[in-house]
A protein has these predicted regions:
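Extracellular zinc-dependent metalloprotease catalytic-domain scaffold
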Residues: 2-252, 257-379
Length: 379
């Protein structure tokens, strides 16, 4: 479930999430494992065309749950708090793309600026996408989904979703102009689609109030590091010192996973090889999909153009769908990052203390490939 190669014990724990990595001098090395083959089976609580619903769980276990919570007044924390949970925050304009942040009671123990950093991360996405839907995300501090986070964890995410098939996924993405012509398309395999992405693709009710997922953020207590709580809505942060990690970057990363930025690359679910929509854009070479947890590259033109190298999770651990950054912050070669020594991609598999995690144009193209309509297309 979790791996850490950092001398200070810092790591990220999540179903699909952001990971801490090594410094410029390779003096620290934080890693976590993507338990992408873990699905927690759940009963579906609202009408949809996909049937039974599942929950991606960070523990790697598969078990049924008795229900799926509504997004209203949802507080799950088992951590003792002296205050009630803050009221939910709805980010975005009614009738457009919205994210409803349902604050867990644990957030009352977060430092000043924590909530605003998460809000600004959500606002970045609502400013970029024009899809008409509302995504409901529970936010915790030092916990996720009512459970303790691993010691030293930066962030975790868990996502509700559905098992469907290749034809359903590709038929919907084809409406956005994408074609699927690789020689090894997994046409007979099953696919996992997060609840949020299913809304985007028109497969479920876009205004459903049930939770789409959870994100949790570590306290960094006892690690010697702290959070940079500076935030803005541009997707390009600043001010992260050498002993800090960029909270807004982690929030951008974790929220994007709930939105569907995850990979499975054939992981077994119910004894069947399972993929995600993003796996259909992970290429080994022109015309050939990777279909493997080993490193491939992101491409939207059947592998002709490399828009960024994916993490080799088979060799390095970490998430399959994150950008390669085990060797350096810019290893993936993603496009459109602002210039600067201390700038890294927010979707990178391994983060670095002292680096601001920003959104690249490759990140935006990745989200567009999942069905999110950009208000301003990438040039």
């Amino acid at each position: 479930m979790i791996q850490s190669h950092d001398l200070f014990g810092l790591e990220l724990s999540h179903s699909f999430g952001f990971e801490l990595g090594q410094s410029d001098t390779h003096s620290t090395h934080d890693m976590t494992h993507n338990s992408g083959d873990s699905l927690l089976q759940a009963l579906h609580q609202s009408q949809n065309s996909l049937g039974q619903e599942y929950l991606m769980n960070d523990s790697g276990q598969v078990a049924p749950v008795v229900g799926h919570s509504s997004s209203s007044s949802h507080t799950t924390s088992t951590i003792t708090q002296t205050h009630a949970a803050p009221a939910p925050t709805v980010v975005g304009t009614a009738g457009g793309f919205q994210i409803k942040l349902i604050w867990d009671s644990s957030v009352t123990g977060a430092p000043k600026g924590f909530m605003q950093a998460v809000i600004d991360a959500a606002q970045y996405y609502t400013s970029q996408f024009s899809n008409k839907e509302i995504i409901n995300i529970n936010v915790g501090y030092g916990e996720i989904a009512g459970g303790q986070m691993s010691a030293g964890a930066l962030g975790e995410s868990e996502s509700y979703g559905y098992l469907t098939n290749y034809a359903t996924v590709t038929n919907e993405l084809a409406k956005d102009g994408f074609t699927f012509a690789a020689t090894n398309e997994p046409t007979q395999s099953q696919f996992f689609v997060t609840s949020a992405e299913a809304k985007t693709l028109g497969l479920v009710n876009a205004s459903a109030t049930a939770l789409d997922g959870y994100v949790g953020f570590g306290t960094l207590s006892g690690t010697g590091y702290s959070w940079n709580l500076t935030a803005n809505t541009t997707g390009q942060n600043s001010g992260t010192s050498p002993q800090q990690f960029d909270l807004q970057s982690v929030a951008l990363h974790e929220i994007s996973e709930v939105l569907g930025r995850i990979g499975m690359e054939g992981a077994s679910v119910n004894n069947n090889a399972t993929y995600t929509p993003l796996d259909l854009f992970n290429f080994k070479s022109p015309g050939t999909l990777a279909l493997s947890p080993s490193s491939g590259y992101f491409s939207t033109d059947n592998g002709a153009t490399n828009l960024g190298m994916f993490n080799d999770s088979a060799s390095n651990g970490g998430d399959i769908a994150d950008w390669a950054s085990y060797q350096s912050p810019t290893q993936a070669g993603t496009q459109g990052l602002p210039a600067g020594f201390n700038v890294a991609d927010a979707f990178a598999a391994f983060g670095y203390p002292g680096y601001n995690g920003d959104i690249s144009t490759s990140d935006l193209e990745e989200m567009a490939a999942l069905g999110y309509t950009l208000k301003v297309p990438v040039a």
